[in-house]
Structures are given as structure tokens and as C-alpha cells.
């Protein structure tokens, strides 16, 4: 059994290496064949943008990649520290553009129209759209392609913002589930430690409101990914997925989100 486990580990690592190298090749080919001089992305201090940054540098070289941290009042200091640390490790051009002035401007412009209405995800989405606009402005000015950083799990259930973090020219992780994102990050760090360990281990958060984590809105990613895979890739029905041992409430919620967002 020891040899079997060893073989399983080797096969797993081979899969992760193959997927990572395919993502690197995809980025390099796409930019090269379309004539883009380089790439830029929003670096949040989270694992998705960290992995995309590593892939971009491996594909293009650090001199052709620009990372932009766009902190809001809800951005944790450790997110800033981790983004700076990762940019330093990879040697990319890095800058910080706070979005608080943009948030204040939108609040002022929309105050008459929003009068009497409670705050909700609208205000969260405005933050994402400010960031998307900043990245697209930099893209227009420099010719660099914006790489979006959302993963398959988030995109499938709509845990992202149209015209916000979805804005860009290439979605590098569009077919990579969140659980695989973690495995790919671990694999890349086994080659050389470019992703700060805290980025991998801390709970994921969009940081669009105080104390927010992804699991406030979604089931644990291990559960989410398994349900998405069963439904989307294997065509299982809700009763069949529930019969596999998943909580009915989780299955119904995930399938509802999938249906709402599949347009």
C-alpha cells in the first residue's frame, strides 16, 4: 500500500505540472499570436491573482508583466503586505492605486438615485467595476492585455462581477476549479517559493465589506467543486448528487446558482 500511495502522489504531481504548463503555454501563445506587448492584472493578495501572476511571469518574463494592487477601505493590511511580497519575489512592476476616491465619487453621483434604499451588493459591485475600469485604462494606455483572475468555481455560480473582475482579455483560470487553484499554487511553490505561504493558507475573501469571506456566500470549495463537477461535467441530476452524500440544501443552492448564471 505504501508503493500505491507513492504512485498516487507522483501521478497527482504530474497532473498538476501538466495543467500548470498548459496554462503557461496558453498565456504565452495567446499574447504572442495576438501581438500584445505584455500583460497586466489586479493583484489582490488572494490566491487566484497570485497564481495568475506566477503563470504570467513564467509565460512572458517579469519584464512584460505589471501587477496593480487597488486597495479599498476593506482591504486587509496582510493583503497589501502579501501582494507586495509576491511582486518582489517575482520582480514585476508593481503599483498601488487606492480606489477610495472612486468609491466616494460614485456614492456622491448615485446618492439622489439611491435615496432611501439600503446598501447591498450594489456597493460591493461598484468597487469591482472601479478596479476593472482602472485596469482597462492602463491597458488602453500601454497596450498590455488585462488578465482576469476568476476561477471556474466562482464563474460557474456567479461569484464575480460583470464588467468588474470579469473585465479583461484572457481569463487564465476559467477552466480551473478553486480546489485545483490551491493544488497548482502548492505545486508551483515546490519548484520555487514565489507565492507567500499566507496567501495559500488564509481563508479566501473578496474584501468588499468588513469581515467578509467566500464561505459567507458559498459552501466550502471542496463541496462546491464536487457538486459543479457532478452536474456540469457528468450530467448528474440533483437527486443523484444528493445520493452521493451531499446535503440537499447545498445541492439545491449550487444548482440554482448555476442555472441563474449559465447565460
Descriptions of predicted regions:
Residues 2-44, 49-263:
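ATP/NTP-dependent adenylation/nucleotidyl-transfer catalytic domains that generate, transfer
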Amino acid at each position: 500500500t505504501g508503493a500505491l500511495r507513492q504512485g498516487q502522489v507522483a501521478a497527482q504531481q504530474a497532473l498538476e505540472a501538466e495543467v500548470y504548463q498548459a496554462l503557461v503555454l496558453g498565456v504565452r501563445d495567446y499574447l504572442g499570436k495576438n501581438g500584445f506587448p505584455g500583460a497586466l492584472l489586479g493583484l489582490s493578495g488572494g490566491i487566484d491573482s497570485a497564481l495568475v501572476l506566477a503563470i504570467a511571469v513564467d509565460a512572458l518574463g517579469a519584464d512584460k508583466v505589471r501587477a496593480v494592487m487597488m486597495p479599498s477601505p476593506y482591504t486587509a493590511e496582510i493583503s497589501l503586505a502579501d501582494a507586495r511580497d509576491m511582486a518582489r519575489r517575482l520582480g514585476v512592476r508593481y503599483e498601488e492605486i487606492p480606489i477610495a476616491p472612486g468609491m466616494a465619487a460614485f456614492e456622491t453621483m448615485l446618492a439622489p438615485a439611491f435615496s432611501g434604499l439600503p446598501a447591498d451588493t450594489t456597493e460591493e459591485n461598484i468597487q469591482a467595476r472601479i478596479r476593472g475600469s482602472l485596469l482597462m485604462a492602463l491597458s488602453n494606455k500601454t497596450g498590455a492585455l488585462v488578465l482576469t483572475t476568476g476561477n471556474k468555481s466562482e464563474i460557474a455560480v456567479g461569484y464575480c462581477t460583470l464588467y468588474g473582475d470579469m473585465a479583461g482579455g484572457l481569463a487564465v483560470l476559467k477552466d480551473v476549479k478553486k480546489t485545483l487553484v490551491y493544488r497548482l499554487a502548492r505545486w508551483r511553490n515546490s519548484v520555487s517559493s514565489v507565492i507567500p505561504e499566507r496567501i495559500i493558507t488564509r481563508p479566501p475573501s473578496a474584501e468588499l465589506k468588513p469581515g467578509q469571506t467566500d464561505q459567507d456566500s458559498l459552501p466550502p470549495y471542496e463541496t462546491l467543486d464536487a457538486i459543479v463537477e457532478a452536474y456540469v461535467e457528468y450530467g448528474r441530476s440533483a437527486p443523484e448528487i444528493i445520493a452521493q452524500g451531499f446535503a440537499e440544501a447545498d445541492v439545491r443552492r449550487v444548482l440554482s446558482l448555476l442555472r441563474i448564471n449559465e447565460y
